[in-house]
């Protein structure tokens, strides 16, 4: 996409996930292999000479169950005469996609606690004031992004784009920046960049200041806007999040920074998960050892937020990561950004349900 937002270049090449050290790399590889090999994630290989049929059209889910862990809160909220809806914090999230042996995959991250993006979900988080600071941009300008995101405020548009790049770097180590148009940092896992990553996570220098000090700029052309998601009204913590999509820049690999004293767990806290596995049934998902119990699988709707499931449907329907990203680029400047909300859909079979709506 040029500076005026008129077009989007093809996505960059996609690479695999790895950890920062030899031991962790082995753990990450073993964990990834375990996830791929789990029966819930496995799809039979095609015979030699067999041509797979075109991807089947997958309709977006008509309804999504409220996670069991949130049902009581949802019922209590619905029973109130005067329902108070807490304000939603502005946020940004990034769906990182690639093509895998079982079809297109999403990079998912495990987080402790009840984040609005799910225990397992897309990299992302709240906007900060530092995200609004000016910095060098390569690709669509803040004005072009404001048009695409349907925002009259250039500062807010810049804040969302910077937050997406920052959160992606903090949570996965992937960095969408470069020295010039078409350039990208090849190895952001160096000690210098790890120091910058730590500073961002501790709310030290913001990303714009970090880039200015290093003579770098944001590669905003590597992001694709997908939609805007607003948390259900009953939730205590709510996000109004702009969701972007991206591929892994050439020469980079995703990493997760371990919590202090828990370095051995870091390798299993993120994984590439086939989109089809997320929507077809119980699935093995990243997390600390034993977090899914003896079965090692879970229904994705119990631990992920609705936008992750909706994106999984769109990605599976596209048939490939490249087709998905190109589909977001085609005519992007002329389409209003869809806004996803979750409306109550009643109770059925002992479960509360939500219905995705778009406006």
List the predicted regions and their residue ranges.
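N-terminal leader/linker segments that precede catalytic domains of diphosphate-processing enzymes
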Residues: 2-359
């Amino acid at each position: 996409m040029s500076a005026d937002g008129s077009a989007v270049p093809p996505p960059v090449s996609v690479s695999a996930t790895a950890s920062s050290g030899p031991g962790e790399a082995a753990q990450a590889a073993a964990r990834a292999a375990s996830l791929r090999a789990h029966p819930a994630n496995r799809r039979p290989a095609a015979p030699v000479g067999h041509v797979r049929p075109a991807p089947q059209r997958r309709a977006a889910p008509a309804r999504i169950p409220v996670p069991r862990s949130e049902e009581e809160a949802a019922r209590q909220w619905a029973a109130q005469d005067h329902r108070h809806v807490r304000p939603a914090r502005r946020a940004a999230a990034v769906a990182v996609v690639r093509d895998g042996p079982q079809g297109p995959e999403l990079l998912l991250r495990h987080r402790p606690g009840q984040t609005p993006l799910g225990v397992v979900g897309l990299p992302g988080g709240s906007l900060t004031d530092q995200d609004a600071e000016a910095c060098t941009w390569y690709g669509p300008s803040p004005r072009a992004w404001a048009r695409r995101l349907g925002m009259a405020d250039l500062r807010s548009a810049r804040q969302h784009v910077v937050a997406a790049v920052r959160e992606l770097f903090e949570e996965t180590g992937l960095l969408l920046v470069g020295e010039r148009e078409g350039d990208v940092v090849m190895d952001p896992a160096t000690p210098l960049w790890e120091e910058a990553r730590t500073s961002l996570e501790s709310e030290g220098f913001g990303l714009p200041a970090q880039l200015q000090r290093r003579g770098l700029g944001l590669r905003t052309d590597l992001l694709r806007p997908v939609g805007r998601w607003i948390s259900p009204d009953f939730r205590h913590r709510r996000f109004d999040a702009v969701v972007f999509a991206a591929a892994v820049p050439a020469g980079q690999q995703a990493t997760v920074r371990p919590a202090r004293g828990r370095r051995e767990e870091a390798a299993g806290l993120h994984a590439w998960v086939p989109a089809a596995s997320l929507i077809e049934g119980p699935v093995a998902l990243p997390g600390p050892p034993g977090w899914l119990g003896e079965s090692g699988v879970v229904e994705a709707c119990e631990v992920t937020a609705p936008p992750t499931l909706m994106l999984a449907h769109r990605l599976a329907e596209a048939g490939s990561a490249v087709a998905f990203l190109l589909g977001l680029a085609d005519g992007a400047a002329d389409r209003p950004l869809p806004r996803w909300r979750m409306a109550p859909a009643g109770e059925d079979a002992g479960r509360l349900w939500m219905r995705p709506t778009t406006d």
